[in-house]
Amino acid sequence: MCALVPSFFTNFGWPSTNQYESYYGAGDNLNNGTFLELTVPQTYEVTHHQNSLGVSVSSEGNEIDNNPVVVKKLNHNASERDRRKKINTLFSSLRSCLPASDQSKKLSIPETVSKSLKYIPELQQQVKRLIQKKEEILVRVSGQRDFELYDKQQPKAVASYLSTVSATRLGDNEVMVQVSSSKIHNFSISNVLGGIEEDGFVLVDVSSSRSQGERLFYTLHLQVENMDDYKINCEELSERMLYLYEKCENSFN
């Protein structure tokens, strides 16, 4: 009787030093016994960890993709990394615009901003000074060019210089004519007066003066003998006087 009852403490599936037959009666099947094989699986710890997280190995990637909270957090982290990278690039570019003495130092972002704010007004003053210097140089260059151009054209201008004539009406039958001429030209006022007398004008008075340069000035006071035959036109008279002067000049050349 005692041989058929198993001991109180079993081996719980661990190999026993005794024969299995000592615990079973004749004709009993070993597979139908009352004792269970309690072997510990090798993946117990992994399975336990997965079960505690509620995610299986095969579906872990799908669960992350389908979890909006996790996806949102990952996207936020990626955006934050990109934002910081762009900010660092911008501040690096700003730092490169500072003077060389400041670029050699490892400046923090606040220091970079502070030095940039101080450096901007200095650059603005430098730009103003450079613009002013440029304008001064342009004025000097332009003046030099004008002088050279005038110097080249001066002989030709003197050779072809003409007198100027202006007429001013004083009354119904009186007019004052002013003539300006160069002294280097051969000019005879008597020849001009002879021409205008033929046109019906009478000389009342004449005066002349000289300037410090090569200029002669004549002032003629003329009257018209017959107002019925001639109406004073100052513009036409000026052109007539200039024509007579040029005619006299050519006759002397």
Curated annotation (Swiss-Prot):
InterPro entries: bHLH_dom (IPR011598), HLH_DNA-bd_sf (IPR036638), MASH1/Ascl1a-like (IPR015660). The keyword NAD does not apply. Keywords: DNA-binding, Nucleus, Transcription, Transcription regulation. GO terms for molecular function: DNA binding; DNA-binding transcription factor activity; protein dimerization activity. The keyword Lipid biosynthesis does not apply. Pfam families: HLH (PF00010). SUPFAM superfamilies: HLH, helix-loop-helix DNA-binding domain. Induction: Induced by OBP3, auxin and salicylic acid (SA). Repressed by jasmonic acid (JA), UV LIGHT, and heat treatments. Up regulated by iron deficiency in roots and leaves, as well as by nickel, high zinc or high copper treatments. Repressed by high iron, low copper and low zinc treatments. One of its GO terms (biological process) is regulation of DNA-templated transcription. It is found in: Nucleus. Homodimer. This is Transcription factor ORG2. It comes from Arabidopsis thaliana.
